[in-house]
Each structure stands twice: as structure tokens, then as C-alpha cells.
Amino acid sequence: MAKEAGRIRRRERKNIASGIAHVNSSFNNTTITITDAQGNAIAWSSAGTMGFKGSRKSTPYAAQVAAEDVAKKAQEHGMRTLEVEVAGPGSGRESALRALQASGFTVTSIRDVTTIPHNGCRPRKRRRV
């Protein structure tokens, strides 16, 4: 017997006024997740999901496009104010932050939460170009 096709259920609109934007910018990609105060994800996007492939994902423009996309998704849930947590060494940090501010959010605080090892794991070998 064939299984019944599952219905695609649209997530219900939450009415959340403020949240936290987690901007994770690595050397290869930039991901932006907007959560509520408890840490439940409301909207997310990345340079890869916006159609950028390969080395184009790590550009500031790709991070800006991803930030504009996630801002539009979060504003559908009624979000107006954001705290921004920026992590990682990538080039998309500042452009993602500027795009979030330009899309109409009131940014209350900006924190750098990049993890710094206290001489933990051995780093990978140096690149010779």
C-alpha cells in the first residue's frame, strides 16, 4: 500500500518583539540564526542557502544577502529589536551586522563571542601559497 503524501505544514506566526541574532562567520561561509530569548530558532539563513557556491560564500556580499533574507523572515514574526552575537574570523561579520541594522531592526547590543583556545588543540598546518 502506498504511503499517503505528507502535508507540508507552514510554521505558525509567533509574535516575538525581541530576539538574539547569532552571526557565525567562518572562513568558508556565514550563517545567521535569529532566536528568541530562550534560544529557540525563529529564522535562519546562510550564504550557501542563498545560492552562493564555493569561494563566493565567504564574501561580505554573500553575508549581506543572507542577513537581509533572515531579517525578512524574522520580521514576519513581529520582531523589532535584536541583540547581536558575532562569532568567527570570517569576512562577513561587519556586512551582516550592517545589513541587519539597515533592514529596520533596533540593535540593542553587539557582542563578540568568538571562542579563543587557552592553548587547546594543535592548529592545522600553515598554508604555503
Curated annotation (Swiss-Prot):
<dbReference type="GO" id="GO:0019843">
    <property type="term" value="F:rRNA binding"/>
</dbReference>
<comment type="subunit">
    <text>Part of the 30S ribosomal subunit. Interacts with proteins S7 and S18. Binds to IF-3.</text>
</comment>
<keyword id="KW-0689">Ribosomal protein</keyword>
<dbReference type="GO" id="GO:0006412">
    <property type="term" value="P:translation"/>
</dbReference>
<dbReference type="InterPro" id="IPR019981">
    <property type="entry name" value="Ribosomal_uS11_bac-type"/>
</dbReference>
<dbReference type="GO" id="GO:0003735">
    <property type="term" value="F:structural constituent of ribosome"/>
</dbReference>
<comment type="similarity">
    <text>Belongs to the universal ribosomal protein uS11 family.</text>
</comment>
<dbReference type="GO" id="GO:1990904">
    <property type="term" value="C:ribonucleoprotein complex"/>
</dbReference>
<comment type="function">
    <text>Located on the platform of the 30S subunit, it bridges several disparate RNA helices of the 16S rRNA. Forms part of the Shine-Dalgarno cleft in the 70S ribosome.</text>
</comment>
<dbReference type="GO" id="GO:0005840">
    <property type="term" value="C:ribosome"/>
</dbReference>
<dbReference type="Pfam" id="PF00411">
    <property type="entry name" value="Ribosomal_S11"/>
</dbReference>
<dbReference type="InterPro" id="IPR036967">
    <property type="entry name" value="Ribosomal_uS11_sf"/>
</dbReference>
<keyword id="KW-0699">rRNA-binding</keyword>
<keyword id="KW-0694">RNA-binding</keyword>
<dbReference type="InterPro" id="IPR001971">
    <property type="entry name" value="Ribosomal_uS11"/>
</dbReference>
<protein>
    <recommendedName>
        <fullName>Small ribosomal subunit protein uS11</fullName>
    </recommendedName>
</protein>
<keyword id="KW-0687">Ribonucleoprotein</keyword>
